[in-house]
A protein has these predicted regions:
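Cysteine-cluster motifs in flexible loop/terminal segments that predominantly coordinate metals
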Residues: 191-234
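Long, charged N-terminal interaction/targeting segments
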Residues: 30, 35-174
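N-terminal cysteine/histidine-rich coordination modules
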Residues: 217-218, 238-243
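Extended non-catalytic scaffold regions that mediate assembly and binding
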Residues: 25-35, 39, 109-112, 140, ...
């Protein structure tokens, strides 16, 4: 699974100038999970991460490369939850190392979507997440009570890692939080769009998208993402053999 590798490199380049706090993941360090969404009223909130008017990005990238993702860990670029005193820019980026999934395109697509949906099943207490998949944004309202009780990106990140690793295809997970000003959140949002385009292209390939590049509406994605064109023609060849 190398389709997202170039996007991982682009992400790491954007983060290169920062000095993150790093926490290795260990089972048991997760924040309290309520098992369902919690409504945090504005009057009970300390602030919002990625609030309207602030930079925000959210995406998940996959790889089978141990060089790109080599351990379960949480990274934080910027102040932690108890150090924030007002609305701030925010990004949550997840890098997942998965097993080799290149044998069956349809199976690969289903596995990736199942893994990605894990993010919708994490319900940290006092940490109300609102996602906008169309805009690739994530906005979080954090309660004052959660901060008093010790909520942190270390424990929130651990909750996400636990959720992702319930899937046996996930070998290692890195969860990255950004709250510092000065990062190019617009560029991160653009990477999120490209990641979504890769997944959407997989869908179209499975639906029998034309292998004539001159008329294909997704030519730009295949040209930019290494391995996509080979995957596309490989599926087309399999379909031709079946016929």
């Amino acid at each position: 699974m190398e389709l997202f590798n170039s996007l991982i490199h682009d992400t790491l380049d954007l983060l290169d100038a920062g000095r993150p706090k790093v926490w290795p993941y260990r089972p048991g360090m997760e924040w309290t999970d309520l098992g369902q969404s919690e409504l945090v009223l504005q009057k009970d909130a300390a602030y919002e991460l990625g609030a309207s008017g602030k930079g925000s990005a959210n995406y998940v990238l996959f790889t089978s490369s141990a060089e790109l993702v080599n351990q379960d860990q949480i990274l934080l670029y910027g102040p932690d939850l108890d150090e924030i005193h007002g609305d701030v820019d925010f990004a949550r980026i997840v890098l997942l190392r998965v097993g080799v999934l290149d044998d069956d395109t349809e199976k690969v697509y289903r596995i990736l979507k199942d893994i990605e949906f894990a993010k919708y099943h994490v319900y940290p207490e006092g940490y109300m997440v609102r996602m906008s998949p169309e805009n690739h944004r994530e906005q979080v309202r954090v309660s004052r009570q959660a901060i008093r009780r010790g909520a942190s990106f270390r424990s929130i990140g651990a909750s996400y890692i636990k959720a992702y690793k319930k899937d046996p295809n996930v070998l290692q997970a890195t969860v990255i939080f950004l709250t510092a000003p000065g990062f190019d959140y617009a560029a991160m949002k653009n990477i999120a769009k490209k990641s979504s385009a890769v997944t959407n292209t997989l869908t179209h390939i499975l639906e029998g998208l034309s292998t004539d590049c001159s008329i294909c509406s997704l030519k730009d994605v295949c040209d930019e993402i290494e391995g996509m064109k080979e995957l596309h023609f490989g599926v087309g060849a399999k379909g031709a053999k079946k016929d």
